[in-house]
């Protein structure tokens, strides 16, 4: 029995070492090199330069590194999910803007990023908040935990209770440990090398990134994403809407939103709500599957705006806003041209 064990060990150990070394060295998702990778990106952005050729990275940790490198508070901070990540300095001429949008962003992201800005003394004079059903509905991503220390610090400050050092660092450690010997990650690493992909980001100065970030934090999507097959997008939007629906309203998330608004308004920070439209086929499918749910969310945002004297821009219905189907990257994201139209008509 002992001999068999030793033979198995002789076979397994080299394979395990090969997997671990490959995963660590190639690291296509920047699981092990996240700090160095993100720090380099933030350093370029802090110079007022744009950065290109970005691969997988933790967008929340990038926000932290960007804010840490700010020399002064921005005039405007844009908070929300990826649906607002193209709203930048060109929307507000003459003002400094920091886009703090993150993919799959929820209310806890807004709280954590506000806690980050406050902790580092970089609260802006104005905040633009992108609100939608996924922001204040049930469920959502746990990605906000990358900034859990700031989330906990913020709640401790406003509630005067709880743990100010609230931290969920263990999931990050667990992810690193599991990825070290993961065969799936090994496969991704081999595929990354075989396709000759590169993790080398580029400082393009004032040039337009093909797939990266502008110096104000806004995203530069690749051409293939900005110019999709519109028929396929429409088909996918309808199918997904009928299949998945929208999350139901969440009283806890709505409560957090109100606590956040209290904090901002007590500090006389100007607030503006933004609702960006969904693809018309997705909107129609949701109304068929969950009648009046979109209407509920839009009414909630508008009434909250009236109650708190906060202006509201946009809406969820693309047709009512005059946004054509051709101005959607996918079912969730309208184009920058559509965003410009929404802001322009709101300001007139």
Label the predicted regions:
Residues 6-25:
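Hydrophobic membrane-insertion alpha-helices, especially the h-region
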Residues 70-164:
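Membrane-embedded segments
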Residues 42-72:
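Short extracytoplasmic
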Residues 289-348:
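C-terminal regions of proteins
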Residues 144-267:
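Secreted/periplasmic serine-hydrolase-like ester/acetyl group-modifying domain
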Residues 263-289:
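Active-site segments of SGNH/GDSL-like serine hydrolases
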